[in-house]
Amino acid sequence: MTRHLRLPLIAVLVLGCSSAPPTPNPTPSASPAPTATPAPTIAPTPTTAPTETPAPTPEIAYAALDGMPADPELANRLPIAVMIDDNVVARPQSGFNAASIVYQAPADGGEDRYMLVFQEVDAPDIGPVRSGRPYFVYWAAEYRAGFGHYGGDEKTLKEVIPSTSGKLIYNLDAMFGSGKAYHRISTRKAPHNGYTSTAALRVVAAAKKYPAQLVDGLGVRPFKDDAPASERPVKGSINVPYGRGASGYTYDPATNSYLRSVSGKPHVDAADGKRVVARNVIVLWMRLSYDPESEPGHRRPVLDQIGTGTAWVFRDGTVIKGTWAKKDSGDLTRLYDGAGKEISLVRGRIFIQVVATGTKVTYDAPG
């Protein structure tokens, strides 16, 4: 039984061993690695630098009275005129180097007085302040200025100021209604110790509701730039006599300015300790007489400032001889050359030297 079972099993095994070998599975070919497609190169967007907004060009303005470059808010503001003492004990005075225009003219008793006119530059110290006179009031009227003074003679206070205040000038009298703008110093004796400042005067002017601005176009003279250095003379001088000493000027070609002297000594401004300097010196001859109605003991000068007369204009180291003309009390004194053309002044401080007809003024200057 057992034998019969083994034979078939062997046969099966033999048959299984003699069959054909199985076909091997094909080995897959290795596929080449895919080539990476390069990413497209993107050109960088150019960065535009932010454009800076240019700073606005400052507005150029020129002061009405002296033609100097100035802050537009100051170039046309109300001028302030202040009467200044020239007694020997009042020297040295304060405020000259801040003034746009300076007047000097004969006064009582053989003395003279100044009037300083301020516009774009402030003066922290002005004085000694003295009383007004009619012709100074009318010069202040040329600019419709605030008029600073310590009282005045009878005619000034009773006739001239009342007829001009609020119309041709704006009264700033230390003795009548504007005293807050003034003070007296202890280092000098009255009446040579009254002082003020442009700031104090403008505060009072504002409180009185005086205008803050000059009437447009009023008081404006023609101006010019400096002559080239090559055209300036190497030296020059001017001498203008007054009762208590001459006013002298020495021309400086380097700065195209006139260095001022009083009685042969350098004129120094007590406010800043610096030499007083002018850019233009104007000499006006006017007929001088004396007021027959002057108070007893006084001889009040009267200057004929309406009409025409002789004028010499010193600028750029040279002199132009011509005439002055003023139509009425509130009109600007105009300056004309020999051909009748209005004379242009150099930008900067103007000194106006008023003398009596016949006064001998000497100078060294081409012209």
Regions picked out by a protein language model, each given a short descriptive name:
Residues 18-21:
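Bacterial signal peptide processing site
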Residues 55-101, 108-367:
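A surface/extracellular/periplasmic glyco- and lipid-processing/surface-interacting theme
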Residues 23-56:
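Extracellular mucin-like PTS domains
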Residues 1-8:
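Bacterial N-terminal signal peptides that target proteins for export
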Residues 13-16:
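C-terminal motif of bacterial Sec signal peptides marking the signal peptidase cleavage site
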